[in-house]
UniProtKB/Swiss-Prot annotation:
This is NADH-ubiquinone oxidoreductase chain 2. Belongs to the complex I subunit 2 family. The chain crosses the membrane at residues 2-22, 26-46, 55-75, 96-116, 149-169, 178-198, 199-219, 242-262, 276-296, 323-343. Its EC number is 7.1.1.2. Core subunit of the mitochondrial membrane respiratory chain NADH dehydrogenase (Complex I) that is believed to belong to the minimal assembly required for catalysis. Complex I functions in the transfer of electrons from NADH to the respiratory chain. The immediate electron acceptor for the enzyme is believed to be ubiquinone. It holds the Pfam family NADH_dehy_S2_C. The lineage of its organism: Eukaryota, Metazoa, Chordata, Craniata, Vertebrata.
Amino acid sequence: MSPYVFLIISISLFLGTSLTLFSNHWLMAWMGLEINTLAIIPMMTYPNHPRSTEAAIKYFLTQATASMLVMFAIIHNAWMTNQWTLFQMANSAASVLMTLALAMKLGLAPFHFWVPEVTQGIPLSSGMILLTWQKIAPTALLYQISPTLNMKVLITLAFLSTMLGGWGGLNQTHLRKILAYSSIAHMGWMTIVMMINPSLALLNLLIYIIATLTLFLMLNFASVTKIKSLTNLWNKSAPMTTAILLTLLSLGGLPPLTGFMPKWLILQELVSNNNIIMATLMALSALLNLFFYMRIIYASTLTMFPTTNNSKIQWPYPQTKTINIIPTLTIISSLLLPLTPLLTTLMY
């Protein structure tokens, strides 16, 4: 891809998200979502391949449907309340419709059908943007209308997402599909606490983005897309194998890693709001995710599939600018649990 084209696409992605984040008018927020959608499609179709083209078309059709529902909810709300202000979603029908539309954009179950297929069909770099940056704008809209959301709808979406995100990833062998189902499950954790404590939902999103970004950068650097390919990664870069292990355990929510923090705080919020049954179900659903993370860890660190090069250590990867930020991101995604009191103080 031409550097100029890549620059234009990157600026468009940034502007689209910024427009949604900083607007207080529904029409401008909707325009930001559309700019985001249209900007990433050329990136998804490069390099040109039938699978990436198919994935881009699936993504476009799904996002266009979600955008249509968003616009319908905006118009219905404006018709009933005479308000175009972003914080005014007083009409309950418009609020439910907006929640479902944003759930489709985020890939929450039962609207998750597009996430694994699209992620599997595009390159790792595009998948990284799709599962991290593209979550920011819809989440910001959910955050801003959080006081008017329907709790029953949120709980249903969140529970389905965590369960289906866990079940869907169990028998997968492709890392991109596993990360797609991981994204669905993490969006479920974020959604269930959105109405109770929106700041905690944003913290969960931030930690998820950092950990997923770290993992995608390492997989892209090693050019690995299948679990089987990870078994020889120790030959090329032993430190990267350790970094992948830590990041996956953090995504799984094991203490004392960073990923344990949002799950711990979310379960604490649910229990304090007398949602004990829901907290129990969410904690059990996290075990499904942990299982397929452990499958990846087992394949990458504890096993060695038959290969022509088992004994020789390969020449290490050349030092690049990309690998320089990986240690920093690994530390952030693994070792921030001691900062929990500080972060909770800032949130409350």
